[in-house]
Amino acid sequence: MAKQTRRVLFKISGEALSKDSSNRIDEMRLSRLVSELRAVRNNDIEIALVIGGGNILRGLAEQKELQINRVSADQMGMLATLINGMAVADALKAEDIPCLLTSTLSCPQLADLYTPQKSIEALDQGKILICTTGAGSPYLTTDTGAALRACELNVDVLIKATMHVDGVYDKDPRLFPDAVKYDFVSYKDFLSNQLGVMDASAISLCMDSHIPIRVFSFLQHSLEKALFDPTIGTLVSEDVNHVCSPRH
């Protein structure tokens, strides 16, 4: 039986905002994201959004190229997510879609400091919650930050939109043409087989809180379709029958 969905967290790659490997935020891609968030919200779904910063800067890559320490590199990556979040927030406001921009780092001139209580209030009020700066600590990925937010906000499902693959595979399909895609994989099998796409800490957090994850290609499908169509991407869960349905 389909589970009635009330609250969802979307994890979006920063690359979804840029075009042709550019670090420039693309107007059309930003407009598409806003349009798709509106479509999901029109189903009476509460939305939290965690956005990456890889289109602007990747912490580990910058650490190697610029010879800066890991902590500084990761903090630079966190700030990149804030830049993307500011762009999304302004684009939503321009369309009269209420939102709250939050940061785990204190920067009151730019965003509200993230707290679960304030964030849940915003969701209850119908605002789209934008969570930036990842987990707020170095050495932790934005995927882990998204999983933390999903647990704190008690979401019904975490949807990860990727730009490179259309689900979870037994090995990297970009390197191995014979890679096999999973329609469903349990949390434990994901961890024991060391599958890619999301890091183990993010999977473990969702497993402990019984939050299903759907991984799909943002290049191929919409957020709304990924949320409600069980044939899209890969479901990572303890229950193969977990299907989301709109609220009525």
From Swiss-Prot:
Primary site of residence: cytoplasm
Q: Which reaction does it catalyse?
A: UMP + ATP = UDP + ADP
Pfam families found in the cross-reference section: AA_kinase (PF00696)
UniProt-listed Enzyme Commission number(s): 2.7.4.22
- Which pathway does this chain act in? Pyrimidine metabolism; CTP biosynthesis via de novo pathway; UDP from UMP (UMPK route): step 1/1
GO MF entries? ATP binding; UMP kinase activity
Which residues does the record give as UMP binding sites? G53, D74, A135, G136, S137, P138, Y139, L140, T141, T142
Q: Where does the record place it? A: Cytoplasm
GO CC list: cytoplasm
What activity regulation does UniProt give?
Inhibited by UTP.
UniProt keywords (A-Z) are: ATP-binding, Cytoplasm, Kinase, Nucleotide-binding, Pyrimidine biosynthesis, Transferase
- Positions binding ATP in this chain are K11, I12, S13, G14, G54, R58, T162, Y169, D172
Please provide the Gene Ontology terms (biological process) for this protein: 'de novo' CTP biosynthetic process; UDP biosynthetic process
- CDD domains to which the protein is assigned, alphabetical: AAK_UMPK-PyrH-Ec
Q: Per its UniProt record, what NCBIfam families does this chain match?
A: pyrH_bact
Q: What is the similarity comment for this entry?
A: Belongs to the UMP kinase family.
Summarize the subunit comment. Homohexamer.
Function field: Catalyzes the reversible phosphorylation of UMP to UDP.
Q: What is this protein called?
A: Uridylate kinase
Q: Which organism is it from?
A: Chlamydia pneumoniae (Chlamydophila pneumoniae)
